[in-house]
Amino acid sequence: MIIKNGLVWEESGSFRKKELVVDTTTHRIAETAEDDTVFDAEGLYVIPGLVDVHIHGARGHDFSDGNSKGLAEIAQYLHSCGVTSFCPTSMTLPEEQLTAAFATINDVPDAAGYAHIAGIHMEGPYLSPEKKGAQKASYLHAPDAAMFRRLSAASGNMIRIITIAPELPGSDAFIREFKDTVAISLGHSTASYEIAENAFAAGANHVTHLFNAMPPLHHRDPGIIGAAADCPHAMAEIICDGIHIHPSVIRNAFRMFGNDRMILISDAMRATGMEDGEYELGGQPVIKKGRLATLKDGTIAGSATNLFDCMKNAVQFGIPLGVAVKAATCNPAKSIECSQEIGTLAVGARADILLLDQDLNIVKIL
């Protein structure tokens, strides 16, 4: 199939009117067409399918439930929203529950109509009790290398990101041991600039939901935010649901980190795509009202927004469209070392493609 006349996104952040060839047999982007099928994309943007590396659940289901059918329904919902690849993200739970959840990724079809599972984001239990957010305090503990090896094996070595608080005992050794096999993300942490700087020097390369569940950027104590901005290999997630982060801070984060290091995420929980009401997250009740999801004490408990809407929010907040697409596609793919496969329109990559109208509504999902 040949997609003609569309404004095709390029990794520079620009759009160019050109043809894009898809091998419909292999579902890969190709150099030459195998058939004469043509899709006229006149007036449409052509972008890669989005990649969400931090998403807990949707449509009443959560990855941590350990329910294969529920995870498959999450994958279907995400695909319908233009999110064609994702890292199901766990909560802080006992090892046996995490083991059961991680095993479910093998049961989700890698087929049309389902978002592709690119790996797992393990958020906890190696987090700070002081910055636990919606994580359950009784399950938190220091990094445990043996436990992580067991969980990695249970997942089929599919853990792509692990969030840790670098101030916890044993964090530096943990980072050094696993930095070559998984992205080490700093988050849910009270770490000072110096502690975070040492963690990045040891091999950490990612920040979990920048600004949330960490000390604010202070002019005398810049903390994780300042250390990450100073570290050229650190990439930073940011929740762009319009609730977690003020639009001005979104704009300034892109200025601080640059267009190549920002990653848009949803941090969506099970109430996403559902009616208002009471739901559950990590063993705790959560109230959803509109786009806001909170614990009963008012603590924000993940988002109720999908990544496509977060990308549209970013554009509304003043981020150029080409830059917002980059932050929702190739940057997250790069962070989990999958940028040749997903989040790109390069020849040989999966043909996960979105066609958008000028108002950024989805016209077609390939």
Specify the residue positions occupied by each region the protein language model found.
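His/Asp/Glu-enriched, well-ordered alpha-helical/loop segment
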Residues: 227-236, 242, 254-266, 271-356
